[in-house]
Curated annotation (Swiss-Prot):
Effector protein involved in non-host recognition and able to elicit hypersensitive response (HR). It comes from Pseudomonas savastanoi pv. phaseolicola. It is found in: Secreted. This is Effector protein AvrPphD. It comes from the Bacteria. One of its GO terms (cellular component) is extracellular region. Its main location: secreted. One of its GO terms (biological process) is symbiont-mediated perturbation of host programmed cell death. Residues 1-36, 136-155, 173-207 are annotated as: Disordered. Residues 1-15 have a biased composition (Polar residues). The lineage of its organism: Bacteria, Pseudomonadati, Pseudomonadota, Gammaproteobacteria, Pseudomonadales.
Length: 710
């Protein structure tokens, strides 16, 4: 007879209840098993296995009951055989307790089968709960097997034998176990999202506390007016997780689609009293989510409705509440209590749902394609021009051994032509990166004119700096000052595609917010509030955290600083490497600095250095913590308002140096670009820009004729 087959048979045999004692034979019988088993007698593998099984919703209750019984010392020795030992505890659950989604269990018998390992610690093999009408069980995966021993086969079979069974017959347990392949890597279902916040929970002076600030804020809210049940977190090793209850990225796309403003009623160019519908396709989801975090359901008007798949409509309030996180724990008493508390607070669910969506909406993604295109264009075309084509063309025009100072203007003009081509292509790549970060589709028809305009500006802005390369000042100080100014001008010219893009986003968002308030989608600012100032502030706060625009603005600040390095270090670097190497390096690294900066900043948002700068995740965690803390302080929804400035300070701190530098550059460049068109308009030609045609005065009285019925 194969001894291993005998062992395997015993593992897969259904557990024997306390009413059917086993004869104590074999190695386990020779051991002196304690009358009661406690957590300290379990192996580390047993604790880890229970934690893994607790991640499964169907096993949470049973795993929690096992932990509680171990902690309370209610498991008593029942029987043992040559492979395992059985302990039993009597469990009395209240009639309204939902045990793993089965019928209510009142009189219950909890048994565990354990095996003594080589370290004289107990590995839990399986656990079973027998009720008045149903039985629930699971097998626990075993720890790693020993080398080449019978226990290796034993471990493999118990690992493959994990089961979850609901049976109508609590007495005849012979059909309770159905093999189910499982492993630690599969303890979380593939469709289950990763936790947004996770923390350990323990009892301290009668209250529950956590090492995670957000989880601690959640616990504080729940126990602000009601204590946790004594069964909650009554044992060590309890963890609590806040998870998205739905596909947040898909929900965000649904929100964008529902609240994109396609047309806005603006003033016509000829008359301030006449209104015309103009295509804007304004994306307002970020300011809308910010306002929902600030004011909860009070952020919306009666027109804030979202169409669902069956053709019906739900309110924005209900939609955001459906995006609020759900709570899971290896202690299901704890998770059920918290979830029940959250379900009773609609305002809190709206704010938490908005925060979940805002976190995804402001996530910055690395844009490899645009970066590769920018570096490729700058390094290949730029190096080809500087290392070969430039000298050949100039020699062909002026002859060999010509005097650069004699033809300074002509040479500078020739050197200003390549930037038109190179920077136009580079600007195209930069605009593609910005569109990608915003999650928007782009077209050649839309981006090419903008890129060509940026190339022309870059060509013109590079001319002064090119002149100084051939005819500098005699004074070293004057020459350095002039080179610094013209170098910065050339840098700004090379990035001239960014400021108009940011300005366009700003104008469209303002128009979209205006129209959404007019249509009753977003709540009216209220009496005594300056609507123009309110909309401008909402737009500014939104763009300061929008993934495309905020990163683009910061990249301007970074480019202005980094772009000066070649000028400052050129004299020192020339003595170390050849001029050709320096030119190749400059074209590959410093010329495409905007594209590099955009992606570097996107990656930098993932880095968290406490006390120095926060990652994007840390900023949003602080927002969630504030929402929960405010709810703890004010149980009434109307008293929980978070000010716009307070929220903005959390997501876009004043300490963001690059944002301030970049904003100054972008605003200055846009003002200079607008100077000539503004002068032309004063002479009576041209149309006012979109921002000047928004009729804020129309919001003095809400336009009820365009609002759907509540």
């Amino acid at each position: 007879m194969n001894p291993l087959r005998s062992i395997q048979h015993n593992i897969t045999t259904p557990p024997i209840s306390g009413g059917q004692p086993l004869d104590a034979v074999g190695p386990q019988a020779q051991q002196s098993h304690p009358k009661r088993i406690s957590p300290s007698q379990l192996s580390q593998s047993a604790h880890q296995a229970l934690e893994r099984l607790s991640a499964n919703a169907e096993h949470q209750r049973l795993a929690s009951l096992v932990r509680n019984a171990l902690q309370d010392g209610t498991f008593q020795f029942q029987s043992s055989n040559h492979t395992q030992v059985t302990y039993k505890a009597s469990i009395c659950l209240p009639a309204d307790t939902d045990t793993v989604r089965t019928d209510h269990l009142i009189n219950n018998e909890l048994t565990v089968q354990a095996r003594l390992n080589d370290q004289s610690e107990y590995d839990i093999v399986s656990a079973h709960l027998h009720g008045s009408s149903k039985a629930i069980s699971f097998d626990v995966p075993s720890p790693p097997p020993a080398h080449g021993s019978a226990s290796s086969v034993l471990s493999e079979r118990t690992h493959l034998g994990m089961s979850s069974v609901l049976s109508q017959d609590a007495v005849d347990s012979s059909s309770l176990e159905t093999p189910l392949v499982s492993s630690p890597d599969h303890s979380r279902p593939p469709s289950q999202p990763k936790p947004v916040h996770i923390g350990s929970v323990r009892r301290d002076s009668g209250s529950l506390v956590s090492d995670n600030p957000v989880v601690q804020a959640l616990l504080s809210f729940v126990q602000a007016d009601q204590a946790f049940p004594p069964q909650a977190a009554s044992i060590a090793g309890v963890q609590l997780e806040m998870r998205s209850r739905r596909d947040i990225e898909q929900a965000l796309e649904e929100l964008k689609g529902a609240f994109t403003v396609e047309k806005a009623q603006l003033m016509s160019g000829g008359s301030s009293s006449e209104r015309v519908d103009e295509d804007v396709n304004a994306d307002i989801h970020i300011p809308l989510l910010l306002k929902a975090i600030e004011r909860g359901a009070g952020a919306f008007g009666p027109g804030a409705l979202i169409e669902i798949a069956d053709g019906g409509q739900i309110s924005a309030k209900a939609f955001l509440a459906s995006c609020a996180p759900t709570i899971t724990s290896n202690d299901d008493v704890l998770s059920e209590f918290i979830n029940q508390k959250l379900k009773g607070d609609d305002d809190l669910q709206v704010r938490l749902g908005a925060q979940e969506l805002l976190h995804v909406a402001t996530k910055k993604e690395f844009q490899l394609g645009g970066l590769a295109g920018s570096i490729g264009v700058s390094s290949i075309l730029g190096s080809a021009w500087e290392l070969g084509a430039s000298e050949l063309l100039k020699n062909a025009i002026f002859g060999k051994n010509f005097s650069p100072s004699q033809y300074a203007l002509q040479l500078a003009g020739i050197d200003s032509v390549p930037p038109f081509i190179i920077e136009a292509m580079d600007s195209f790549c930069v605009l593609v990166i910005i569109k990608g970060m915003k999650g928007e589709l782009w077209s050649m028809k839309d981006l090419l004119p903008k890129a060509l305009k940026a190339g022309a500006i870059s060509s013109a802005m590079s001319f002064p700096n090119n002149v100084l390369q051939y005819a500098g000042f005699k004074s070293r100080v004057a020459d350095l000052a002039a080179n610094s100014i013209t170098t910065e001008a050339a840098i700004f010219g090379a990035a001239s595609g960014i400021p108009p893009e940011v300005k366009e986003s700003e104008e469209l968002m303002r128009a979209g917010l205006f129209q959404s308030m007019k249509d009753g989608v977003m709540a009216h600012p209220g009496e005594g509030m300056d609507t123009k100032e309110t909309i401008e502030r909402m737009t500014r706060h939104a763009l300061d955290i929008a993934p495309g625009e905020s990163t683009a603005v910061k990249s301007m600040g970074l480019a202005a600083i980094v772009g000066m390095i070649p000028l400052i270090a050129s004299s020192k670097a020339t003595g170390l490497v050849s001029e050709q190497i320096l030119r190749i390096f400059r074209n590959a690294v410093f010329n495409p600095i905007e594209a590099i900066a955009l992606n570097a900043l996107a990656l930098g948002g993932r880095v968290n250095v406490p006390g120095l700068f926060d990652s994007d995740n840390a900023k949003h965690a602080r927002v969630a913590q504030t929402i929960l803390a405010r709810a703890s302080q004010h149980m009434e929804a109307g008293d929980r308002e978070i000010s716009a400035e307070e929220l903005h300070q959390m997501l876009a701190p004043r300490s963001e140096f690059l944002r301030h530098v970049g904003s100054a550059i972008v605003n200055g460049m846009n003002a200079s670009f607008e100077a000539i068109p503004a002068l032309v308009r004063k002479l009576g030609y041209g149309e006012a820009p979109l921002a000047e045609r928004i009729p804020y005065q129309d919001l003095a009285v809400p336009d009820t004729s365009r609002q759907p019925a509540p």
